[in-house]
From Swiss-Prot:
Gene for this chain: rot1
Mode of membrane association: Single-pass type I membrane protein
Positions of glycan attachment: N52, N130
Pfam families per UniProt: Rot1
InterPro entries recorded: Rot1 (IPR019623)
Lumenal side: 21-214
Transmembrane segments: 215-235
UniProt keyword annotations, A-Z: Endoplasmic reticulum, Glycoprotein, Membrane, Signal, Transmembrane, Transmembrane helix
Main location: endoplasmic reticulum
Entry similarity comment: Belongs to the ROT1 family.
Protein name: Protein rot1
UniProt subcellular location: Endoplasmic reticulum membrane
Amino acid sequence: MIVEYFLFNLLVTIISASNAADLVGTWTTKSRSVVTGPAFYDPINDIFIEPNLTGMSYSFTEDGHFEEAYYRALANPTEPSCPKGIMQWQHGTYSVKSDGSIELTPIAVDGRQLVSDPCSKDVGMYTRYNQSETFNLFTVSTDAYHHVRRLDLASFDDAPMHPMYLVYKPPQMLPTTTLNPASLETGKSKRHVRRDIARSASVGGFIRSDDLINPDRWLWFGIFMTAMGGIAIIYS
């Protein structure tokens, strides 16, 4: 399948040899609404800024750093009027392997994810996000229709991703160092922050409040609730 996909690209694009240097810059999908950098995630206030349209963006530097931004809508077959919204951001380092694959290694404490389910919850789930990624193949070309540089990625299972187009070179990114060192957890201290949703992304206006939560806490919370016989416990 992946071979046929890239053979098709040969017919519609002007192909150039792809190497690590070709990746440098900021790439975004056709809507151009989602772009990495401070217009998507504000690390000072720890909030997302909602784009006008869904999409994704990747940035790569010459010295091996990356940043990614996603804004997606997930269909709800049982209630079509209630799609979920997901915003994701992370950054870290990348390497291009000898077989042409790309491996992304995020800074674990910095990644963020915001999930909105407007018809089942009054709150948006705001959590840390840390997901290593592998792209089995990439090509950089000049798109024959748009006449701009185009990046095609094949995911870990060889499925082609949406093409992205170069919008900035050098890339538009946040600092490549750790942005949230206070988020590091120890056995004695865990961070649980409640933030004013008025300053956060609404994901289509569906979210009224949000929390930065360590996902592991939900397991222990559930065990504790069961042990207490279902007594409601509220704490900050």
